[in-house]
C-alpha cells in the first residue's frame, strides 16, 4: 500500500473541492491519499441538499461568504480558517473508516485530548463533536 500526502494552500472552496474530486477520481489502486485544506468563510452543502433549505442565503451574501457543494452526501457545514479539513481517499481494498477514525482520535489522545470515535464516525473530545466524517 502506498500513502500520498497533499496540502492545499489555496483557501478558495471551489478550488479545494475540485482538487479533492480530482484526487478521488485519479487515485490508483492500493493507494491512500491524505488531503488537508482550509476554506475561507464558506458553507459547504452535501450533494443532495437544497441550499435554500439548509442555508440562510441572504445572510451568507451579506457576510460575503461563499456557498459550495461537495460531490459526496452529508450535511451542511461551516468552514473558515479556524478549522482544518481532511480527506482520506482510497478504494475499498485499502480504506477502513473505523480504522481511519481511530487513528485520528488516537493522535488527539497522544496530544492530551480526551478523544473518542462515536457511532456515527464523528470524533468527540470530552463529549463534544470536533470532527464530522462521511
PLM region spans:
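N-terminal lobe of the biotin/lipoate ligase/transferase fold
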Residues: 1-95
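Catalytic beta-strand/loop module used to bind and position nucleotide/cofactor moieties
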Residues: 81-134
